[in-house]
Amino acid sequence: MKASMFLALAGLVLLFVVGYASESEEKEFPIELLSKIFAVDVFKGEGRGCKGFGDSCTPGKNECCPNHACSNKHKWCKVYLGK
């Protein structure tokens, strides 16, 4: 009787420890994912020889990256959606 109670208690403790460890990993995963997503700035054209989203430009000079166009009104590169 004492052995079965000890085994049941040890099983519950083990279950608690495993559950806590997996929960802490689950909590860290979204944080790691978000940090990796926001560490990469895909909107900037640095190192590509073209200007990315939000960079200042001169209309008519074709300085913006592909799929971007220089706004005549605001004078910065924006995503070109076409018409």
UniProtKB/Swiss-Prot annotation:
Looking up Pfam families in the UniProt record yields: Toxin_12
Tissue-level expression: Expressed by the venom gland.
SUPFAM superfamilies membership:
omega toxin-like
- This protein's major location comes to secreted
> Out of the domains of life, which is the source?
Eukaryota
- The keyword RNA-binding is annotated on this UniProt entry: no
Q: Record's GO cellular component, any one?
A: extracellular region
Query: What keywords are assigned to this protein?
Result: Amidation, Disulfide bond, Ion channel impairing toxin, Knottin, Neurotoxin, Presynaptic neurotoxin, Secreted, Signal, Toxin, Voltage-gated sodium channel impairing toxin
* Residues recorded as bearing Leucine amide in the entry: 81
Q: Tell me where it resides.
A: Secreted
Leader sequence range is 1-21
The UniProt GO MF terms for this protein read: ion channel inhibitor activity; sodium channel regulator activity; toxin activity
Which InterPro entries has this protein been placed in? Huwentoxin-1, Huwentoxin_CS1
**Domain remarks:** The presence of a 'disulfide through disulfide knot' structurally defines this protein as a knottin.
Q: What does this protein do?
A: Lethal neurotoxin. Selectively blocks tetrodotoxin-sensitive voltage-gated sodium channels (Nav). Does not affect tetrodotoxin-resistant voltage-gated sodium channels or calcium channels.
Report the family membership.
Belongs to the neurotoxin 10 (Hwtx-1) family. 15 (Hntx-3) subfamily.
**What name goes with this protein?**
Mu-theraphotoxin-Hhn2j 4
Recorded source organism is Cyriopagopus hainanus (Chinese bird spider)
